[in-house]
Amino acid sequence: PSFEYGDLTSIAVHPKENVVVASVQAKGYNDEGYAVFLSGDGKFLSAVKVGVQPDNVTFTPDGKKALTANEGEPREGYGEGVVDPQGTVSVMDVSKGFQHVTAETVTFEAFDSKRDQLVKDQVILKKNTAPSVDLEPEYITVSEDSRYAYVALQENNAIATIDLTTNEAISVKGLGFKDFSVKGNELDLRKDGKVQLQNENVNGIYMPDGI
């Protein structure tokens, strides 16, 4: 396809075939990116449009699907007239060959009506935003049976689960907070040239990047 490319953010190697896939963001921050499939010797096989700002790509263990975590960050900041793209996960079927790949993009729109519950479950969300916009997929891992994808939502301090049989987001779970006043959770907050671990009356947010 002809499009202005931005960052190449991630690559993955197929578990069985001599094929790699790369996630490529568009130059425009609010434009959809592509998953590009190449043979092991660099021959172009296909390119499939995915969501906005694909940040990570992986194959399922059975090799039948590829997935991208499309972060959809508001890279131009917040404010009037600024677009905050939806965060999504694209699921690609590669079972019919790497030159005949089809893609379906999974959104989090089903959670827009559950915003209050997400906040109660300690999912971090910006005020007055819909979860489908504010959730930002960062990284994906897939269960050994290739049935479920687990998606790190770093800025939201949460993990989403995607059912790969139905290609639906079925849960978003907050990871809670780390209490540094508890014994065993000591840290050093002081920039004084010394290393002195001690408890502090603060909480931390896990915010996982990889998973």
Predicted features and spans:
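Solvent-exposed loop segments that connect transmembrane elements
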Residues: 185-191
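Mobile, glycine-rich extracellular loop/lid and propeptide segments
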Residues: 1-184, 200-210
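Extracytoplasmic loops and strand-loop junctions of Gram-negative outer membrane beta-barrel proteins
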Residues: 131, 193-195
